[in-house]
């Protein structure tokens, strides 16, 4: 049973998926830090010049006693767009590499005259 689990766990697809999940989680933290520390302050500075003292991170309104935090939503959308763009570039690079490999793969040579004659004989014998 352990041997079967070991074979399953160390197959390429499962191991690749595990590595992808771990790297994705780490990348998500990097994007969150980038948005929190760099992008949102820049957007806040630009909007504060236009709207006077605006901090997007604290944008919210309340319905009754429930706060609706629009700033958090905007921050999350920006994070999503960054991750989606990076993944788009990654997939685009992989696809272009695959296309190059497909083009570089040599086509099978046409069958020789002998093979064509043998096929004709085979086909005529099958009739």
From Swiss-Prot:
GO molecular function ontology, one term from the record: mechanosensitive monoatomic ion channel activity
UniProt cross-references to InterPro entries, sorted A to Z: Mechanosensitive_channel_CS (IPR019823), MS_channel (IPR001185), MSC/AndL (IPR037673), MscL_channel (IPR036019)
Membrane spanning stretches: 8-28, 30-50, 70-90
Topology versus the membrane: Multi-pass membrane protein
Entry GO CC: plasma membrane
Self-association state and partner proteins as the record states: Homopentamer.
Family assignment from sequence similarity: Belongs to the MscL family.
Protein name, UniProt field: Large-conductance mechanosensitive channel
Organism: Herpetosiphon aurantiacus (strain ATCC 23779 / DSM 785 / 114-95)
Gene: mscL
């Amino acid at each position: 049973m352990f041997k079967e689990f070991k074979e399953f766990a160390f197959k390429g697809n499962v191991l690749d998926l595990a590595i992808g999940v771990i790297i994705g989680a780490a990348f998500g933290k990097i994007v969150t830090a980038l948005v929190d520390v760099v992008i949102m302050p820049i957007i806040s500075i630009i909007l504060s010049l236009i709207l006077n003292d605006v901090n997007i991170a604290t944008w919210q309104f309340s319905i009754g006693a429930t706060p609706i935090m629009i700033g958090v939503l905007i921050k999350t959308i920006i994070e999503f767009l960054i991750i989606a763009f990076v993944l788009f570039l990654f997939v685009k690079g992989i696809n272009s590499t695959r296309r190059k490999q497909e083009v570089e793969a040599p086509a099978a040579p046409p069958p020789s005259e002998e093979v064509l004659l043998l096929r004709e004989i085979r086909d005529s014998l099958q009739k």
